[in-house]
Structures are given as C-alpha cells and as structure tokens.
Amino acid sequence: VHLTGEEKSGLTALWAKVNVEEIGGEALGRLLVVYPWTQRFFEHFGDLSTADAVMKNPKVKKHGQKVLASFGEGLKHLDNLKGTFATLSELHCDKLHVDPENFRLLGNVLVVVLARHFGKEFTPELQTAYQKVVAGVANALAHKYH
C-alpha cells in the first residue's frame, strides 16, 4: 500500500481512538445485514434472522472484534500485508472457502462505520487513506486464491 507520511500518521492517530470491540462488531454485523449471503459462513453463530438479531448477536460482536484486531495488525505492517495475512488467506481460501469479494465488501463497510463513529474527524483525506488500506488488506487476504 502506497501511503504518504501524512496518511500514515493520520491512520495511526485515528486507529488509536478506535474501540475494536464496538467497531468490529458493528462492521461485521452490518456486512451480514447488508450482504445477507455472507451469513452462510456464520450459520453456527445462532440467530441471524433479522438486522436486530445480527447486531445484538454476541458471537458476531466477538468475531468482529477478532477481525478488527487482525486489521489493526495489518496497520502495523503496511509494507508487508501479504505476509501479515498469509495464514488468514490460506484459512479463508482452503478451509472456509470464503469468496474473496467478501473481504472488499467488509473493508468498505468498515470505512462507513469509521465515518459514522468519528464524524467530521474522519476527513476525506483519512477516508482516502483507509480506502487504500482496506483495499490492500482485501488483496492480501485474497492472495492465496490467485
């Protein structure tokens, strides 16, 4: 991912304020609501029958936190996203058979959730930087598929 020094410092400063549990759960929940076909990977999470059920589901929240913690690790290794996500790419490709397009969708949902939580602080410049990173992470997670 090619970022300017200003973009990197902006990403880091905002990320330090992110509540990984809250934003991770909301991002994954929104993915499952807006793109319901993604629920097939999470049938073992229990009730996903309504938007309210998804957003309140503790397993969705917990897994969202795990996903966002991994994303945070990626932010520490922007120069080696493929290496950072190699094991997760293999897991999602070989064992879970997740459509790699879902990584892009989740990245876009994450940007929306960050914008919702941070309002005016989430400037167009920060959005640009986060869009670059989520695209890079999605590409790294899809790497094993190629």
Swiss-Prot record:
Tell me the residues on which Phosphothreonine occurs. 12
Q: Which GO terms describe its molecular function?
A: haptoglobin binding; heme binding; hemoglobin alpha binding; metal ion binding; organic acid binding; oxygen binding; oxygen carrier activity; peroxidase activity
Positions binding heme b in this chain are: 63, 92
Q: Which residues carry this modification: N-acetylvaline?
A: 1
Query: SUPFAM superfamilies from the xrefs?
Result: Globin-like
Q: Does the keyword Ligase apply?
A: no
UniProt GO BP: hydrogen peroxide catabolic process
Q: Where is the Globin domain?
A: 2-146
The keyword Glycoprotein appears for this protein: no
Q: Which residues carry this modification: S-nitrosocysteine?
A: 93
Alphabetical list of InterPro entries matching this protein: Globin, Globin-like_sf, Globin/Proto, Hemoglobin_b, Hemoglobin_oxygen_transport
List the GO cellular component terms: blood microparticle; haptoglobin-hemoglobin complex; hemoglobin complex
What tissue expression does the UniProt record report for this protein? Red blood cells.
Query: Which Pfam family, any one, appears in the UniProt record?
Result: Globin
Modified sites of kind N6-acetyllysine: 59, 82, 144
Q: How does it assemble?
A: Heterotetramer of two alpha chains and two beta chains.
The record's similarity note reads: Belongs to the globin family.
Q: What is this protein called?
A: Hemoglobin subunit beta-1/2
Provide the species name.
Physeter macrocephalus (Sperm whale)
- Gene that codes for this? HBB
